[in-house]
A protein has these predicted regions:
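N-terminal metal-binding scaffold of metallo-dependent hydrolase/deaminase domains
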Residues: 1-69
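His/Asp/Glu-enriched, well-ordered alpha-helical/loop segment
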Residues: 17, 278-285, 327-426
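Metal-coordinating catalytic core of metallo-dependent amide/deamination hydrolases
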Residues: 154, 158-291
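Active-site gating loops and adjacent loop-to-helix segments of metal-dependent hydrolytic enzymes
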Residues: 95-126, 179-190, 255-285, 305-308, ...
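Divalent metal-coordination and catalytic microenvironments
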Residues: 17, 35, 77, 88, ...
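Alpha-helical scaffold segments that flank or form the walls of functional sites
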Residues: 79, 97-168, 195-212
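C-terminal cap of metal-dependent C-N hydrolases
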Residues: 23, 407-461
């Protein structure tokens, strides 16, 4: 098997403006900064306020001969930011994005989504579609994605192969679903459901056997409790206990209709937190998508167990209802929060669009709570799209910002030079870098993303 693609044979070096987050409230904008990436793709040095005349000395201090590799001097209106992290994405829904507006969640699944996902029984269709999906996300600067695949084992393996071949960091999960889906699109029985997930986990371990830092890992993925009976949930809980390095992802308190059906199926449990905890699927490795309607006890449980929330503001507000997750309250309680495109329930794969919608819905929440939950700032939304997402995915020791020792997953953003200026607000001569950064976040798009790096390797198509 081929190992994960790595950086080129030479280090990378940059001088210019570096922007990243250390916490939800600590955004660092670092002008005149020297950043050095070693040949393995790790950040070796980050030195703010660097005079260009001292760069050769810094290179030598880090063990390299000056002039052996070029230093990229970022133009005045350009900067580096960490790669975006999509904490919730349905890769098989790539071609159905934007469809089914106005439908309830369960009707959307039954009338549109299950039929589309069933197409992935065809491995050639899976290869074409997953290749396009991963290329598309990389173009948007999404360097890491947590993917739900379909129920098909062969197609799920293809998604993992595509991610690694194209250099995207990914969590890939085979969807477990043995009930409340059409007979032509559900697992044959509970035993088969758990068995195929076990096989996928083992396959990924063998897939990564020659790589001590794999980009692609498996994630345990019960679609939601409605689609999994107790035998499946119990079996997946056992897999989670036996594979302590793996994340767990599911949909959690997404819509009132879904929550009511879950209560009917599992009447012995007071709420979803108790349900998933009972089966060993709720802990610090859990990535819980949506989390709209949590009871007080559930919030306390998520905080105590250090669970992560994948906030999906586009899909939450563009289907049948306008649903607003209490993100400010989650942050107040120290609950990990990242952003998810939720493609294709979400119509956009742009993390810039997701950030903007997170800002919008938090403003609605502030109005709803009469100011008790203040709106998120633009800087906080940027944190959620980068370091917050890394925390949710259990990758913050490796990516999410430019701390020395982390891997260089980054976007080179251009706001003026060589960029079509018909969408982003024009950058004017007197604009401070803080103003330029906000213009990019609020009015920019993928045309402003000149380069995308994963572990030091340029990957944008």
């Amino acid at each position: 098997m081929n190992a994960t693609p790595t950086a080129t044979g030479l280090p990378l070096a940059f001088h210019g403006t570096i922007i990243h987050s250390l916490s939800p409230t600590d955004l660092q904008i670092l002008p005149n900064t020297f950043l050095l990436v070693d040949i393995a793709g790790n950040i070796q040095a980050l030195v703010p306020n660097t005079d260009p005349s001292t760069i050769n000395t810094l290179i030598a201090d880090n063990g390299y001969a000056p002039d052996v590799f070029p230093v990229k001097h970022l133009p005045k209106h350009s900067f580096l930011i960490p790669g975006f992290i999509d904490t919730h994405n349905h890769a098989p829904q790539w071609a159905q994005r934007g469809l089914g507006r106005g439908l309830s969640l369960l009707d959307w699944l039954e009338t549109l989504t299950f039929a589309h996902e069933a197409k992935f029984e065809d491995v050639e269709y899976a290869k074409r579609t997953y290749s396009a999906a991963v290329d598309g996300l990389l173009r948007q600067g999404i360097t890491t994605a947590s993917y739900y695949a379909s129920k098909h084992l062969a197609a799920t393996k293809i998604l993992a192969e595509v991610c690694r071949a194209k250099g995207q960091r990914a969590l890939v999960g085979r969807c477990n679903m043995n009930r409340h889906a059409p007979g032509w699109y559900r697992d044959l029985n509970a035993g088969v459901s758990v068995k195929e997930t076990r096989e996928f986990i083992q396959w990924v371990r063998e897939f990564n056997a020659n790589d001590d830092r794999p980009l692609v890992n498996a994630v345990i993925t019960p679609r939601f409790a409605i689609s999994c009976d107790e035998e499946v949930l119990s079996g997946l809980g056992a897999l989670a206990a036996a594979n302590q390095d793996l994340r767990i992802q599911t949909h959690f308190n997404e819509a009132e209709q879904q929550m009511e059906f879950t209560r009917q199926l599992f009447p012995d449990f007071r709420h979803e937190a108790e349900l998933y905890a009972r089966f060993g699927l709720l802990n610090e490795r859990s990535i819980l998508a949506h989390c709209i309607f949590l009871e007080e006890e559930e919030m306390e449980t998520l905080a105590r167990l250090h669970c992560g929330v994948a906030h999906c503001p586009i899909s939450n507000t563009t289907m049948q209802a306008f649903m607003v997750a209490p993100v400010r309250e989650y942050l107040r309680r120290g609950i990990k929060v990242g952003l998810g495109t939720d493609s294709g329930g979400g119509h956009s794969i742009s993390m810039l669009e997701v950030m903007k919608q997170a800002f919008v819905v938090s403003t609605a929440r502030a109005t709803e709570t009469r100011g008790a939950d203040p709106a998120l700032s633009v800087a906080e939304c940027f944190f959620l799209a980068t370091l917050g997402g890394a925390q949710v995915c259990g990758l913050d020791d490796r990516v999410g910002n430019f701390a020395v020792g982390k891997e260089f997953d980054a976007l080179e953003v251009r706001t003026r030079e060589g960029v079509e200026m018909d969408v982003m607000a024009p950058v004017e001569d007197g604009d401070a870098i803080e103003v330029i950064f906000e213009k990019f976040l609020m009015t920019g798009d993928d045309r402003n993303i000149a380069k995308v790096y994963v572990r030091g390797r340029a990957v944008k198509v």
